[in-house]
Amino acid sequence: MGVTKAEAVAGDGGKVVDDIEALADLRKEPAWKRFLSHIGPGFMVCLAYLDPGNMETDLQAGANHKYELLWVILIGLIFALIIQSLSANLGVVTGRHLAELCKTEYPVWVKTCLWLLAELAVIASDIPEVIGTGFAFNLLFHIPVWTGVLIAGSSTLLLLGLQRYGVRKLEVVVALLVFVMAGCFFVEMSIVKPPVNEVLQGLFIPRLSGPGATGDSIALLGALVMPHNLFLHSALVLSRNTPASAKGMKDVCRFFLFESGIALFVALLVNIAIISVSGTVCNATNLSPEDAVKCSDLTLDSSSFLLRNVLGKSSATVYGVALLASGQSSTITGTYAGQYVMQGFLDIKMKQWLRNLMTRSIAIVPSLIVSIIGGSSGAGRLIVIASMILSFELPFALIPLLKFSSSSNKMGENKNSIYIVGFSWVLGFVIIGINIYFLSTKLVGWILHNALPTFANVLIGIVLFPLMLLYVVAVIYLTFRKDTVKFVSRRELQAGDDTEKAQVATCVADEHSKEPPV
């Protein structure tokens, strides 16, 4: 009996199954079990939205504007859910992560620049985590910040050592750290009791009133979208088994979307709690003059006083544990992102501890120098500089992601719909425009108001403004460059595999037909 391309021989009796995918469907687990098996990548990724850099911008937004900027967090995390789902879908459909696709798509000089920028983004994201961990050790054990920074250089290696027992166990530990941090801030919020009506108004009614509201909202939005996260999410999803059938890939994409939604909802609640606590305490009518001075320039190391009136001496411990969980868990994701960036662009695979040591060694140098010379205030300013670098980096990860996920050459029949494409590009360029505005205004403001001699500022301007022009040209190039390289998707690979299986089945069936009857 002949067997067609879409047929396969199954069982001892030679029963023919008309659709290869139907055989896989017979063995499927319940949907909820398959969903649970895909939990992990979203929680790893959501840590970037809970890192010490985000905590600092949240604290300042609450202190300066109470609850008025909560809507920025809501919009930012909705956009984050969209682009993170695009990143996950890209990995699921193509079987490759973003760094690998960039390496294959772009010319040598372009992909070299993208690799260097991606590495810089990983290092810049590690600086707030190192400093935040140093502040946490300072609060918990009363050691100098620079000593805490040194300890932070090696502490994450202990957590990464869990990977030898399996990635899933490391993901469980990371998820526990997320919930520890969330629990700390929810406890804080329940104690200070911000007015619910004002919190809801701030969350759903956009307002930009008061001095500095625009700048603080830009800082909030810029701190939410991390470029290294886009490389990370597209790679983490590859650790799960993905069926090559169209239905199987859609199911997996849906699972990752739901999981990312849950993880980012937790991140939203934590960010709301941080802003609400800061806004409630710093805008209280009975605030002491000493605390009012702290609220005027709120930083990570000075924020434990927010709970002093209700928790006493234990406020520093609760806040320190939350800050430590934030710094340590965020560092793990940065290490993974750096490894995938290096492997994707250069085909170099490094051990986790070695990759962490390399990234941390580079990030710890400026953190250590600044914390020794400038103390806590200098370390806080370094966090702001690192956030500016990440804002600068964003287009060089976001634009390739938007182009690849909308390309029929990369995604085939699974490419984004015209509505998702339009919505993603509009939101993407809004974020990019905001980041460029934030970066340029900060640079121009610094040039106009620093204490350097006039001729030094002129030289800085001569160097910086051509670089800014080059930056804009690079963004335009990435946006309008035609997508040229076509990839064979999982679905096309499966189709070829089905053809081969059908040919083998045909040969087997022919051999059976030639055998004399018993």
Curated annotation (Swiss-Prot):
Alphabetically, the GO molecular function entries are: cadmium ion transmembrane transporter activity; iron ion transmembrane transporter activity; manganese ion transmembrane transporter activity
What is the protein's membrane topology class?
Answer: Multi-pass membrane protein
Name the UniProt key words of this record, in alphabetical order: Ion transport, Iron, Iron transport, Membrane, Transmembrane, Transmembrane helix, Transport
Locations listed in the record: Membrane
A cellular-component GO term for this protein: plasma membrane
Report TM segments. 35-55, 68-88, 107-127, 131-151, 172-192, 218-238, 255-275, 315-337, 357-377, 382-402, 418-438, 458-478
InterPro entries named among the record's database cross-references: NRAMP_fam
Keyword Cell membrane found = no
In its keyword annotation, does this UniProt entry include Transmembrane?
yes
Any single biological process term in GO: iron ion transmembrane transport
| One Pfam family hit | Nramp
Q: According to its UniProt record, which protein family does this protein belong to?
A: Belongs to the NRAMP (TC 2.A.55) family.
What the protein does comes down to: Probable metal transporter that may participate in the control of iron homeostasis.
Please name the HAMAP family in this protein's record: NRAMP (MF_00221)
Q: What is this protein's record name?
A: Metal transporter Nramp1
Give the organism, scientific name: Oryza sativa subsp. japonica (Rice)
Tell me the classification of the organism that encodes this protein. Eukaryota, Viridiplantae, Streptophyta, Embryophyta, Tracheophyta
Q: Which gene encodes it?
A: NRAMP1
